[in-house]
Amino acid sequence: VHVAHLDHGLRPDSADDAQFVAGIAREWGFAISIERRDVAAIAAKRRLSLEEAGREARYTFLAEVAQEEHVNLIMVGHNADDQVETVLMHLLRGAGMGGLRGMRPLTPMAAMHLATATPVPAELRLGRPLLPVTRAEIEAYCNEHRLQPRQDASNAETTFLRNQLRHEVLPLLESVNPNLRAALRRMAAVFTEDHRVLQQATRAAWEQVVARR
C-alpha cells in the first residue's frame, strides 16, 4: 500500500490535513506521497469551477504517483451517499444513460483524459471499494474501532453544488420520499445494466456491418 494525499491549498488548515494523513501512514507503516497544488490558480487559468479544477488536479496527481510507484490500481473512498449525490447532480445537468449510472466501482484512468506529464497506462484503474457502503455505516465502523477521522470543514459549505445537494436538496426530497437514496441507487443500477446491454448490442451490430480489410 502506498498512500497519496493532495493538498488543494484552498483552506488555511489544509496543511494540517496533510500532516494528519502523514501521521496515520507512518503509524501503519505505509509509504506516502504528499504534494500541494494551487487549485484556485488552476481554476482561474483554465476557467474551471473550483470543484472541477480540484477533481482534475487530484486525479492527475494520483495517476502520476501511481506511475512513479509502478502500480496499476488507485483506490479512493467514495461511498454510497456520494453515489446518490453524483447521480442527482448528473440528473440535474441532463446527463444521458452513461452519466445516470453514477460512479463505477472500477474505472480506467486513461478514459479520464488527465493532463499528466506522460500518457496514462491503459491498465491503470481507479477503484471505489466503499461504493456499496453508506456514510453512516462508515462512521459506525470508525466509532466501533475507535478511529478518529479528520473532517473537511469545506464539506459544510453550500457554495459547492455537491454540498448544496447534500445539505439542502436531498433532505427536502427525502421529506417527500424517505427511501429516495435507495431509489436513486436502484435507478443507477438499472441504467448500468441497460448501458451494458446496449454497448454489447452495439458492438455486435458493428461487427456485422463493418467490413475488415
Residue spans for each PLM region:
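Core alpha/beta nucleotide-donor-binding catalytic domains of modification enzymes
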Residues: 1-171
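ATP/NTP-dependent adenylation/nucleotidyl-transfer catalytic domains that generate, transfer
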Residues: 109, 116-124, 159-213
